[in-house]
Amino acid sequence: MRPDCTDFRQLFLDDVPMMDMRAPVEFAKGAFPGVVNLPLMNDQERQKVGTCYKQQGQAAAIALGHQLVSGATKQARLEAWAAFAKAHPDGYLYCFRGGLRSQIVQGWLRDEAGIQYPRVKGGYKAMRTFLLETTQQAVEQCDFVLVGGLTGTGKTDVLHQLDNVLDLEGHANHRGSSFGKRATAQPAQIDFENQLAIDVLKKRARGIGQFVLEDEGRIVGSCTVPLELYQGMQHYPLVWLEDSFTNRVERILRDYVVNLSAEFKAVHGEEDGPRLFAERMLQSMANIYKRLGGERHQRLSEMLREALQEQQRSGAVDLHRGWIEGLLNEYYDPMYAYQRAAKAERIEFAGDAVEVREYLKARALRQPRK
């Protein structure tokens, strides 16, 4: 039999298949990419066992657990675990601390299905701690540079052309602005942190010692950038991306109207997609009411509403340029100009997309690999 695992680094570097014995409510709060939740107990069973443990102690709780997970229920779960083990002979199982739940499942697989299947020692908690430390160590040991620029300059497009990027918006499934929500939900906070840490781990394993980040706020939609990383972002050097006003308007039209409306259709269907897209856009505009002020918000909202109606009627998106131009001129550009002035001392290079991309590639070559 393969031994139980304590090499968390290799588990994540190799995307080793794992099954999680925790209850669905625990799994939903945070898990690891690609892991399958095949719980020993469902949420209701776990709650009953937990209450029993508090009132009557461990022995009574274990006895109740065996009573709840028995007969056809036990058989169905055993078949699911066995199927996973056979499909992934190189995998592992784990529970919260790598203790009783995973040991019980190991024993049932061995005794009743004839399958020897190893567990991850320390379980979810130990792997989670390892990933938190991975991010912390990168902040302490690696070099970082930020890419900033006015809204619509194509910062994400440039980042995706680099091999040393940490895509905070990608991991958060959010574009980072007031209009940044996607058609699909954002990950749980812990999932966001875990995905980011695994990205760091894999890139460092390839010898990357310098990372490029987009200049973000602490909050990306509903996801919060890890504190140690965000604190570093307040003093990392900054590269400023520039582009013409016309190009920026067209890029925003592409990303936030054409592509996003298509995304809503793909996810929610031809009938519900356009309606949900329109509701999302109007809500995004409503979210910045206080920052826009009443008159300006009313005027831009009406322009957005007319553009959405025309898009739904004919498919044309031309009217969207009106509110985009207004929002840039009257809100985003003044705000970013103020932010740039405050960060001027940290800006080490400014240029268009090609110049910034080549500068960042050359910069990475000058840094020691770690």
From Swiss-Prot:
One of its GO terms (biological process) is tRNA wobble uridine modification. GO terms for molecular function: transferase activity, transferring alkyl or aryl (other than methyl) groups; tRNA 2-selenouridine synthase activity. Keywords: Selenium, Transferase. SUPFAM superfamilies: Rhodanese/Cell cycle control phosphatase. The active site is at residue 95. InterPro entries: Rhodanese-like_dom, Rhodanese-like_dom_sf, SelU. Belongs to the SelU family. Monomer. This is tRNA 2-selenouridine synthase.
